[in-house]
Swiss-Prot record:
Keywords: Antibiotic resistance, ATP-binding, Cell inner membrane, Cell membrane, Membrane, Nucleotide-binding, Translocase, Transmembrane, Transmembrane helix, Transport. This is Macrolide export ATP-binding/permease protein MacB. ATP binds at residues 41-48. It comes from Rhizobium meliloti (strain 1021) (Ensifer meliloti). GO terms for molecular function: ATP binding; ATP hydrolysis activity; transmembrane transporter activity. One of its GO terms (cellular component) is plasma membrane. The gene is macB. The chain crosses the membrane at residues 272-292, 524-544, 573-593, 612-632. Homodimer. Residues 5-243 form the ABC transporter domain. It is a multi-pass membrane protein. Signal peptide: none annotated. Non-canonical ABC transporter that contains transmembrane domains (TMD), which form a pore in the inner membrane, and an ATP-binding domain (NBD), which is responsible for energy generation. Confers resistance against macrolides.
Length: 647
C-alpha cells in the first residue's frame, strides 16, 4: 500500500527578479499514516517551506508530491483547497486566530468551507472546546484568552474537519513551559487516536517527543531516525470522513453576511466614515430628484391648468414696447371677435390689464385690474369661489361690478366679513363686489395669481384703463390635435387685418414641452451632482476594502489553509463591500426621504416616486459590487503560504 504522504525528488526555488534561491534540494520523503514525526532544523534550513508543501499551502518547483498514491503536484487552487479541507489540520506558532471571531467561531471555520450545517458546526465546535477544557471560554475572543488557551483553540480548529494529518508549526514556540508541555501532550493524544502528526520545530527537546525525527539543513534532509512506528490509520480515516463535503457554506449569503458584519464591527469608526460617503451620495440622489420632480410637477400642473388646448395672442415685442414710427399696441376687441369665427376655435378671451388702487374704509391697496369677458374662467380653468362671475349683461351695460382674488379679499376685508354685495373704490370709482375667485396660488413665474381684481372688459376700457387696445387674447381650440393649424390660421388672419406681422402667438402645448425638456435637463444635472457624491462614496468603499485586505492578509491565509477556495474569499470580501453599501444605501434612502419631507414642511414642492429611490439604492449596491471587486479579487489571489507569513 502506498504511504499516506510521499515526496519524490522535490525542490523549491524562489525567484526575485533574475535571482533564483533554491530552498529545498531534491527532497524525497515518505510518511505513513499514524506516524508522529518531528521535522527539526534551524532558521533558514527550509523546514517551514517543507511544511508548506506538505500541507498543500505551496507547490514544489519540481518533483512530485503524492497523497495516498495520488500525485497532487498538478492540482489547481480549488483542488488543493479541497485537499486541505478534508485532510489537514494546522496548528501555528502564533495561533493565527481570527481576532474578530469568538473561540467557537474560530473553531468552526474549516467546517464552514466544508459545507457543514450551522447546527452541526456549533455542536462539534462546542464538543471539541469542552474536551480541551475551554467550555467556559466558548464565546471569548482571542484577546480575552491566554496564549495556552489560544493554542488549544487552534488545536480544536485543526480537528474540526477530522484533521487526518496534523501539521504543527512550532506549536510551543510562543508558550511557557507548562503550556508547551500541555500542547505536546495533546499532540501525543491525537497521535494515539490515529492522527498523523507532523511537528515542525527547532527545539530538540520538542522533537525528542516524536517517534520519528527528520533533520533538515540548508534544504537537504541530513538525518531521518525512527524510534518506533505507529499505524492507527483506520481511526484517523474514519474521523476525517465524518466531514460532509459539498458546496462551501461561504456561498450561503447569510453566513457571508454574518462574517462581513463581524469584520466591519471590528473597525466601527472607519466603517461609519465609509458609510457616510454612501449615505450622502444616496441621500443626495433621493432628495434632489424628489425636490426637482416636485418643482417640475408643480410648474407643469400650473401650465396644465391653463390648458394644452390654448393659444395666447400678444402684440410682438417691438409693438408692445413701442418703436420709432410705430404704435404701441395693436390688438383690439374686434380681433378677438374675428378669431372666434375661425374653424376649430371654441372662443377667444380678450384681456386688458393695468395697475389700480383699491380702497375700502381706511385701507388702500395697489393691485392689478384685469378687464375680461365671461369665458375667462373656462379659458383659465379658474373656478369662481363665491358669488358669481361677470356675465354678458354686465358687458353690455358697462356694469361697475368686480370679482376679487383671494389675496385682495384678505387685504381689504381683514375682519373676515363677506365681501359679496359690498362696494370698493377702484381708482376712486365705486365697484360692487359680485364674486370671489377660488385660490390659485403662485403662477409658473412665481407671481401671486390671487392678487387681482376682475372687471368687465367694456367697463374697464371705458372707466379704468382709458384705452381700447387689449393686452392678450386667450384662444381655446376645439380639437387640440389641430392646434398648430389653428395657430397658423390665426396668425394669417391678424396679419391680414393689421396689414403687417405685429403679433406673436404662444402655444401652451409647446410651452409645456419646452419646460418639460428644460426641467428634465435640470433633473439630470442635479442627479449627476448627486451621483458624483455616490461615486466618492464608492471610492471610500474601495479604500476601506483595500485596507481591510492588507490588514487581514494573515486571516485570508488562515481561511485558505482551512479549506477556503479562491471564490470563497472573493465572495466574502464582495459581500463585505455590498453590506457596507446596502447599509449606507438604506440609511441614505431614509436620510433623503427625511430631507424631502422636511423641505415639504417648509412649503417646497416635493414629489417622491419609487423609481428614483429604488435606482439610488440599486446604484449604491452596484457601487459596492464594482468598487469591492478589485480588493476582493486581490484577496482571493493571495497564495496561502505568502498570506500566512504576512506581518
Amino acid at each position: 500500500m502506498a504511504p499516506l504522504i510521499s515526496l519524490q525528488d522535490v525542490s523549491k526555488t524562489y525567484f526575485n527578479g533574475d535571482i533564483a534561491v533554491e530552498v529545498l534540494h531534491h527532497i524525497s520523503l515518505d510518511i505513513e499514516a499514524g506516524e508522529f514525526v518531528a521535522i527539526i532544523g534551524q532558521s533558514g534550513s527550509g523546514k517551514s517551506t517543507l511544511m508548506n508543501i506538505l500541507g498543500c499551502l505551496d507547490q514544489p518547483t519540481s518533483g512530485s508530491y503524492f497523497i495516498e498514491g495520488e500525485n497532487v503536484s498538478g492540482f489547481d487552487s480549488d483542488e488543493l483547497a479541497a485537499l486541505r479541507r478534508r485532510t489537514f489540520g494546522f496548528i501555528f506558532q502564533s495561533y493565527n486566530l481570527i481576532p474578530t471571531a469568538s473561540a467557537r467561531e474560530n473553531v468552526e471555520v474549516p467546517a464552514v468551507y466544508a459545507g457543514v450545517s450551522a447546527r452541526d458546526r456549533h455542536d462539534r465546535a462546542e464538543a471539541l472546546l469542552q474536551s480541551l477544557k475551554l467550555g467556559e471560554r466558548i464565546d471569548h475572543r482571542p484577546n480575552q484568552l491566554s496564549g495556552g488557551q489560544q493554542q488549544r483553540v487552534s488545536i480544536a480548529r485543526a480537528l474540526m474537519n477530522g484533521g487526518r494529518v496534523i501539521l504543527a508549526d512550532e506549536p510551543t514556540g510562543a508558550l511557557d513551559s507548562q503550556s508547551g508541555d500541555e500542547v505536546m501532550r495533546l499532540l501525543r493524544d491525537m497521535n494515539e487516536n490515529g492522527h498523523t502528526v507532523i511537528v515542525i520545530t527547532h527545539s530538540r527537546e520538542v522533537a525528542a517527543q516524536a517517534d520519528r525525527l527528520i533533520e533538515i539543513s540548508d534544504g537537504h534532509i541530513v538525518a531521518d531516525r525512527s524510534k518506533k512506528r505507529r499505524s492507527n490509520r483506520d481511526a484517523a480515516v474514519g474521523l476525517a470522513q465524518r466531514t460532509r463535503e459539498g458546496f462551501a457554506a461561504i456561498a450561503d449569503v447569510s453566513e457571508a453576511v454574518k462574517m462581513a458584519l463581524r469584520a466591519l464591527r471590528a473597525n466601527l469608526f472607519r466603517t461609519i466614515l465609509t458609510l457616510l460617503g454612501i449615505v450622502i451620495g444616496v441621500g443626495s440622489v433621493v432628495a434632489m430628484l424628489a425636490i426637482g420632480t416636485g418643482a417640475q410637477n408643480s410648474v407643469l400642473d400650473r401650465i396644465s391648468s391653463m390648458g394644452s388646448d390654448l393659444l395666447v395672442v400678444r402684440p410682438s415685442m417691438a409693438n408692445f414696447r413701442g418703436s420709432a414710427g410705430g404704435t404701441n399696441v395693436t390688438l383690439v376687441p374686434a380681433d378677438a371677435d374675428a378669431i372666434t369665427e375661425l374653424a376649430n376655435v371654441a372662443f377667444a378671451v380678450p384681456e386688458m390689464t393695468s395697475t389700480v388702487t383699491l380702497r375700502r374704509g381706511n385701507i388702500d391697496y395697489q393691485t392689478t385690474a384685469n378687464g375680461t369677458v365671461p369665458q375667462f374662467t373656462e379659458a383659465k380653468s379658474w373656478k369662481i369661489g363665491r358669488g358669481e362671475f361677470i356675465n354678458r349683461n354686465d358687458m353690455e351695460t358697462y356694469a361697475p361690478v368686480a370679482v376679487l382674488g383671494e389675496t385682495v379679499v384678505k387685504t381689504l376685508f381683514p375682519e373676515g366679513s363677506d365681501p359679496i354685495g359690498q362696494y370698493v373704490l377702484v381708482n376712486k370709482i365705486p365697484f360692487q363686489v359680485i364674486g370671489v375667485m377660488s385660490g390659485m396660488g403662485a403662477s409658473a413665474g412665481g407671481n401671486d395669481q390671487d392678487d387681482v381684481v376682475l372687471v368687465p372688459l367694456t367697463t374697464g376700457s371705458m372707466r379704468l384703463f382709458g384705452q381700447r387696445n387689449i393686452r392678450t387674447i386667450t384662444v381655446k381650440v376645439q380639437d387640440a390635435s389641430a392646434i398648430d393649424l389653428t395657430q397658423e390660421r390665426i396668425q394669417a388672419l391678424l396679419n391680414e387685418r393689421h396689414r403687417k406681422d405685429d403679433t406673436q402667438i404662444t402655444n401652451m402645448s409647446s410651452v409645456r414641452e419646452a419646460f418639460t425638456e428644460t426641467s428634465n435637463t435640470m433633473k439630470f444635472f442635479l442627479g449627476s451632482v448627486a451621483a458624483i457624491s455616490l461615486l466618492v462614496g464608492g471610492i471610500g468603499v474601495m479604500n476601506i476594502m483595500l485596507v481591510s485586505v492588507s490588514e487581514r492578509t494573515r486571516e485570508i491565509g488562515v481561511r485558505m489553509a482551512t479549506g477556503a477556495r479562491e471564490r470563497d474569499i472573493l465572495v466574502q470580501f464582495i459581500v463585505e463591500a455590498l453590506v457596507v453599501s446596502a447599509i449606507g444605501g438604506a440609511i441614505g434612502v431614509v436620510a433623503g426621504l427625511s430631507t424631502g419631507y422636511a423641505a415639504k414642511a417648509f412649503g417646497m414642492p416635493v414629489s417622491f416616486t419609487p423609481g428614483p429611490v429604488a435606482l439610488a439604492f440599486a446604484c449604491a449596491f452596484l457601487t459596492g459590487l464594482l468598487f469591492g471587486y478589485l480588493p476582493a479579487r486581490n484577496a482571493s489571489r493571495l497564495q496561502p503560504a505568502v498570506a500566512l507569513s504576512a506581518d
